[in-house]
């Protein structure tokens, strides 16, 4: 959508300048301008209260201006707030075009944030930085200044993300370039240290005796939990106990969608195929392997489309995947990368995360792309000696957020998200196999009728 200058928007919205609405609008504009000027003349102790009044005034003005704007459809699940750190999770947005009023409000908020920062009122400044970026997510100066603010708070990863986002929008922004050059090596060191922590926990898991009954119990429970969460992320409403019932008895759950139950059976078939065929196989991962995984994932729901590339264009949130005629070529290139020396030299968690992202970016299938991508990710982890990980349904928003950020040009938050999931899985295994073990929810320690577990390789 092409945005007109504010004066143009106002003129189109109300050509009768003598109307009550027109007079009110210009009075509001004038009051905002005078109010901002007054802020410079007021004693410093009054600025904090004034900035809040200014923001309230902008909210009123924005509500009037928005009446002149075209109605924009609400974003899909992928167009949501972005989690960049635990402190500011869900407070920054991506892929949103600011209105003229929003940009004006963002500039006012940034100026007030810098003033609050100068006064040492960092809590107020923090909220104003976030407000500025909420109003205008592409405000490069606000991204850069918030990055500096985050650095001062020792949040190097968030600062580096903000500089990177600023440079994605404006590649030659001098201040962001200088700041990013400073934070990039620090962030790389932090990421490598985190990988080392994960590696040390993998070694502890590998030291658990192969015959450990506690390990077997938790892996069986993890199997059910993985199926439950991976289909729940896609909207499946079956409960964990219902999924256990389906897989253990092979009987349908009365009153529940047969399609949802077939999704569970398909996931079970795909995981069984991976466990018995691919995990221990020596050699490269082929395109046929991925097609076979997908054939099982979707085979009980849509056997016609299972195991074949899509033939229609799809839209995933803001992301437009490759045209159907380009899918096979991109999958060939993806397969070459999967088996390349560059990929093999990556840390296993980074390799698995990138493989997941690349496959879901291509979106080669009409349905089942997310489930297939997560299975491929776990295949790579297991081949490297790691346990399979679970992305829980409660993490759905964060999961989609970091995928959206990757689509915007920074895949590192997604890699860190997968690393976090890996660490949680390792901690669960270590906790469950200690003397004071804690079972997973709805676990049944004495259950032994289910044999197809996802193995932890010795």
From Swiss-Prot:
Cystine pairs: none
Active site: 363
Marked site positions, Important for autoinhibition of adenylyltransferase activity: 234
GO cellular component terms, A-Z: endoplasmic reticulum; endoplasmic reticulum membrane
Catalytic activity as recorded in UniProt: L-tyrosyl-[protein] + ATP = O-(5'-adenylyl)-L-tyrosyl-[protein] + diphosphate; 3-O-(5'-adenylyl)-L-threonyl-[protein] + H2O = L-threonyl-[protein] + AMP + H(+); L-threonyl-[protein] + ATP = 3-O-(5'-adenylyl)-L-threonyl-[protein] + diphosphate
Any one GO BP annotation for this protein: response to endoplasmic reticulum stress
TPR repeats: 106-139, 140-173
Signal peptide segment: none
Topology of this chain in the membrane: Single-pass type II membrane protein
Cofactor(s) essential for the protein: Mg(2+); Mn(2+)
Entry-linked PROSITE patterns: FIDO, TPR_REGION
Superkingdom classification of source: Eukaryota
Subcellular location: Endoplasmic reticulum membrane
Residue intervals on the Cytoplasmic side: 1-23
Glycosylation, residue list: 275
Gene3D superfamilies, per the entry: Fido-like domain, Tetratricopeptide repeat domain
Cofactor: binding comment: Divalent metal cation. Prefers Mn(2+) over Mg(2+).
Pfam families: Fic
Domain Fido positions: 285-420
Record text about domains: The fido domain mediates the adenylyltransferase activity.
Family from the record: Belongs to the fic family.
Classification via PANTHER family: FIDO DOMAIN-CONTAINING PROTEIN DDB_G0283145, PROTEIN ADENYLYLTRANSFERASE FICD
Name by which UniProt lists this protein: Protein adenylyltransferase FICD
Originating species: Mus musculus
Taxonomic lineage from the root: Eukaryota, Metazoa, Chordata, Craniata, Vertebrata
Gene transcribed to yield this protein: Ficd
């Amino acid at each position: 959508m092409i945005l007109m200058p504010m004066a143009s928007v106002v003129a189109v919205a109300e050509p009768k300048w003598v109307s009550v609405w027109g007079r009110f609008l210009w009075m509001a504009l004038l009051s905002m301008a005078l109010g901002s000027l007054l802020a410079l003349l007021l004693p410093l102790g009054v600025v904090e209260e004034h900035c809040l009044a200014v923001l309230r005034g902008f909210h009123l003005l924005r509500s009037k201006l928005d009446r002149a704007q075209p109605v924009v459809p609400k974003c899909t699940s992928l167009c949501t707030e972005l989690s960049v750190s635990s402190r500011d999770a869900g407070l920054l947005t991506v892929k949103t075009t600011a209105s003229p009023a929003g940009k004006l409000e963002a500039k006012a908020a940034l100026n007030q944030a810098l003033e609050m920062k100068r006064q040492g009122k960092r809590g107020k400044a923090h909220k104003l930085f976030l407000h500025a970026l909420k109003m205008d997510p592409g405000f490069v100066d606000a991204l850069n200044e918030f990055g500096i603010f985050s650095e001062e708070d020792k949040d190097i990863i968030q600062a580096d993300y903000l500089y990177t986002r600023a440079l994605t929008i404006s590649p030659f922004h001098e201040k962001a370039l200088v700041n990013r050059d400073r934070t990039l090596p620090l962030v790389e060191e932090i990421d490598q240290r985190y990988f080392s922590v994960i590696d040390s926990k993998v070694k502890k898991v590998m030291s658990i005796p192969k015959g450990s009954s506690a390990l077997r119990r938790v892996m069986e429970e993890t199997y059910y939990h993985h199926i439950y969460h991976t289909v729940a992320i896609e909207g499946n409403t079956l409960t964990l106990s219902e999924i256990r019932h389906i897989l253990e008895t092979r009987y349908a759950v009365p009153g529940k969608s047969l399609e949802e139950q077939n999704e569970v059976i398909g996931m079970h078939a795909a995981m069984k195929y991976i466990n018995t065929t691919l995990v221990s196989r020596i050699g490269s991962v082929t395109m046929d392997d991925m097609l076979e995984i997908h054939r099982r994932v979707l085979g009980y729901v849509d056997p016609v489309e299972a195991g074949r590339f899509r033939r229609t264009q799809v839209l995933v949130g803001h992301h437009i995947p490759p045209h159907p005629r380009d899918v096979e070529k991109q999958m060939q290139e993806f397969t070459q990368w999967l088996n390349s020396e560059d990929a093999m030299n990556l840390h296993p968690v980074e390799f698995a995360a990138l493989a997941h992202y690349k496959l879901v970016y291509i979106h080669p299938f009409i349905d089942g792309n997310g489930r297939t991508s997560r299975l491929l990710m776990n295949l790579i982890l297991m081949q490297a000696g790691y346990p399979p990980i679970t992305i829980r349904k409660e993490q759905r928003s964060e999961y989609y957020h970091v995928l959206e950020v990757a689509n915007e040009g920074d895949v590192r938050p997604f890699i860190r998200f997968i690393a976090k999931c890996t660490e949680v899985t390792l901690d669960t295994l270590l906790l469950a196999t200690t003397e004071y073990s804690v079972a997973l929810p709805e676990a049944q320690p004495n259950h032994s009728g289910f044999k197809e577990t996802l193995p932890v390789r010795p």
